[in-house]
Each structure stands twice: as C-alpha cells, then as structure tokens.
A protein has these predicted regions:
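C-terminal motif of bacterial Sec signal peptides marking the signal peptidase cleavage site
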Residues: 14-18
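Bacterial signal peptide processing site
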Residues: 20-23
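Short helix/loop segments within enzyme catalytic domains
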Residues: 53, 65-67, 160, 166-203, ...
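Catalytic zinc-binding patch centered on the HExxH motif and its immediate surroundings
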Residues: 85-117, 298-332
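Short pre-active-site segment immediately N-terminal to the catalytic Zn-binding motif
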Residues: 121-138, 153-159, 335-352, 368-374
C-alpha cells in the first residue's frame, strides 16, 4: 500500500523578511572582499552571506573547471558583482539604463558590462526563506554559468543557453556538496532546489523559440539533474547538441482558459483508455499479454470499510492512500484527501498517480520482485515517465488525451508535494520519471533493488 503525506515545500505562505543594509563590498575586477567566514560544518542562513560564500566558491570552481571543459582560463568578471534593491543604485548594462521595475525580483548576467547583479531585497530573502540556502547558491551558479558562456563564446537559442546554465549549476552543486555545509544536498535540500527551479520556470504556453524562454519546470529540473549526475562536460555538449525542450502549446482558447486542466470526472475515462492501450502495446513489445485492470475506484477513508481480497484495510492506513489491490485487480485512491490535493496541482498530477498504479499492476503481471519498496517505487515512476512520453509524442494506439502546457511540471510538483513511505526523495523520483520519459523503458529495470 502507498500512503502519501502532504509536505510543506510548495504550500509555504509568503512572509516578508526584514532586510538590512548590505555589509558586502565588491571590487570592479570581480573580487569579493573578505567577509564573515562560516566555521567548518556550520550552515549560513543570511542570504547576503550565502551569496558571498557561493560566489567565492564559484570563482574557485570555474578557475579549475573551465580549462578542463573549454581549454581556456577563466578571467575574473570585469564588472564584478552588484547587489541591488528598490532604493539602491542600479548597475549600467549596455546602452539601456536599468530601472528597478525591469529587474525587480531577478538576478542577471550583463554581457556588455561583464557583471552579475541580483535583487538582494525582494528575490534572495524570499528564495532563502521558502527554498533554503542551496537554492540561493543555485541562482548565483546559474548566472555565473552565463559568464562562463560569454568567455567560451557559446552561442545558441536563448532556451538552450538558459538550460545549459541550469546544467552547469547542477554540476557545481554536486561538486560543492561535501565542501561547504551551507550547500549540502543532504535531506530535502535537493527537493527544495527543485521546487525553486519550478518557481522560476516559464509561464505556461511560452514557446521554446521565444527570445525570453528559460524552459518549463520539467526542462529546467532535467537540465539541473543532468549536470548534477554527469558533470560539466555533459553540459558543454548543449551548444552542439541542444537538449530537447518540451514546450507544449495550448490547443485552443478554452485550453488556455482552463490552464490545460480537465475536471477529474472528464479526465478519468480517456485516461484509463490511454493507459490500457499503452500497457497493452508495451506488453506486446515484451512478448507478453496485458490483462486490463478491472477497476479504478475512489474511496472515502471515513465512509465505511475498504476491502482488498476480502480483507478490510485498516482505516488509519487509508487516509491519503493510493494503492493497487492485486486480489481485486483494482486501483484505489483516497477521493476525499488525496484526490482533491492532486486536482489542485493539475489534472496530470492525478494522471501520473494513476499511471503509477497501473505500473504497479504491470510489475505484478510481469512477476517483478517488488519486495524492495524503494526500488519498485522508482521503477513505477520510470514507467510513468515512459507513459507520459508516449502521450507527448502521440504514440498511443487510438490515443484520446493530449498533453497541455504544465502537465509534466504537475508530475514533478506532485513528487515535491507528497512524501511516500519508501524513502525515495522527490529528486530521485523525478530522475526516475525523466529517465523513462527520455530513454524509454530500458533504464527502468536498473532501478529495481
């Protein structure tokens, strides 16, 4: 049985943080003046100090990494590093004067002046409070990566450059993890960083060809994970081989008006039909025959007994539960607690959860050993990614549903919003889902314990 617990990552209220005048000073040649050092093993909480430590480490990281990746030295930033706020002077950036309205709640690299600037009043304190120090470091690493691109003369579409910057940021996060406690990836730090990237994703429906495109949440988290897993060398290949961008347009004005979401009662029948067709085709490729799932049933945890194979499921195990009952060949989901939470995220959050239950049914039919809950869960997440890719590519026989903008992001948001009992993090679940989406079913088997 799978029971989910609601996590606070994406439901934290916005609370204003009091800000004081910065004690940081910056040289025009890009050198950060010495400031307070964090004792070994101590984590910093003040956003200004977090930024300072991140920039110092990023300079050192790229001084050693750039010659290895691009066979050239990293030259210090000519314009340095400039924090700003609504009441402080803004840096110049080329011929166009900057105003706070333009750059509020933002961070940027200005190629014309070769400087990195950030809103230290209305961006970083909020990110720090909601998503933690690692996310603040990630934002600075992303902008630093743009300075690297400028020096390496990397050219490409805007979205390619932005995703490469996310990838380089992921490579730095993997490298800095054991060196600076403030940027440790232990616990839920990587999940919080993923939530931060989702916060900074493109608005729904922005095409990948747009001059302002940074990528969907799925695109950005995928690029970050590739850098984290495969290092800066993998990121450097983006210039010659741009990563795929999953930019899904709205299909109609009505689709845009609803944010691409269907009510669950309208979604269920075509979703089940697509799942049945998908798994029948997948089993056919394996030389097997798919046995359709008998039922999908929502239940009320407090509305009377729920049975599986004639045995009553304890009431305290039903709240926020979604499970596949082998004996009854039925996918069950808490229709009072879990279902409304999924629907609030978006229709494909529910679609992903039901696809996952179908994947568990597939494990049973294929005789896969699911005794390792964590491995079996990641395998199911991977197969969910394979299904999502088939929907996206319109490869399902007699397909009835088509993805809308934000659908893949809804899967990741659900991973972040709900914690399971098997110990897998949202970061790990997203990686498993991404592997299935990008590579198909082949890597899914490797996730089994």
């Amino acid at each position: 049985m799978r029971r989910w617990s609601l996590l606070p990552l994406l439901v934290v209220a916005l609370v204003g943080a009091a800000c004081t005048q910065s004690d940081l000073t910056f040289d025009g040649d890009g050198a950060v003046q010495p400031g307070p050092d964090a004792p070994a093993g101590e984590t910093l909480e003040d956003p200004d100090e977090v930024v300072e430590v991140a920039l110092e480490d990023l300079r050192s990281y790229w001084a050693s990494t750039m010659p290895e990746v691009y066979d050239t030295a990293f030259e210090p930033l000519r314009g340095g590093y400039v924090p700003y706020g609504p009441d402080s002077p803004l840096p110049a950036c080329g011929d166009e004067p900057l105003t706070y309205d333009i750059v509020a709640e933002n961070a940027l690299y200005c190629p014309a002046e070769d400087l990195i600037a950030w809103d230290r009043v209305n961006l970083l304190p909020d990110l720090q409070q909601r998503f933690g120090s690692l996310t603040v470091g990630l934002v600075m690493a992303h902008e630093f990566a743009h300075a690297v691109q400028s020096r390496a003369l990397v050219r490409g579409a805007t979205v390619t450059l932005e995703l490469q910057a996310d990838c380089f940021a992921g490579a730095w996060v993997d490298d800095v993890d054991e060196r600076i406690a403030t940027f440790s990836t232990d616990g839920d730090a990587l999940d919080q960083a993923g939530a931060g990237l989702l916060e900074l994703r493109d608005s729904l429906g922005v095409p990948g060809s747009s001059s302002s495109a940074h990528g969907s949440g799925f695109d950005r988290v995928s690029a970050f994970q590739e850098g984290f897993e495969d290092g800066p060398e993998a990121c450097a290949t983006y210039a010659a081989e741009p990563p795929p961008v999953v930019a899904i347009p709205f299909g109609s004005a009505n689709d845009a008006a609803t944010g691409g979401n269907l009510p669950i009662d309208q979604l269920l029948d075509p979703l089940v039909a697509d799942l049945e067709s998908f798994f029948a085709a997948l089993f056919g490729e394996l030389g097997e025959t798919w046995d359709p799932v008998d039922r999908v049933e929502a239940f009320d945890p407090g509305g009377g007994p729920v049975t599986c194979g004639g045995d009553e499921v304890p009431e305290d195990e039903l709240e926020m539960a979604a499970f596949y009952c082998v004996a009854d060949d039925t996918a069950y989901i808490d229709g009072v607690g879990l279902l409304p939470e999924l629907e609030a995220i978006g229709d494909f959050a529910f679609g992903g959860e039901l696809a996952r239950l179908y994947a568990i049914a597939a494990q049973e039919q294929l005789g896969i050993d699911a005794s390792d809950d964590r491995g079996a869960g990641l395998h199911a997440d991977c197969l969910t990614g394979v299904f999502a890719a088939a929907e996206f590519l319109q490869e399902i026989p007699e397909q009835r549903l088509f993805l809308s903008p934000g659908d893949l992001d809804e899967i990741i948001i659900a991973f972040l919003a709900f914690g399971g009992e098997d110990g897998a993090t949202a970061f790990e679940r997203t990686a498993a889902f991404r592997a299935g989406f990008v590579e198909g079913a082949a890597p899914c088997e490797d996730l089994l314990g």
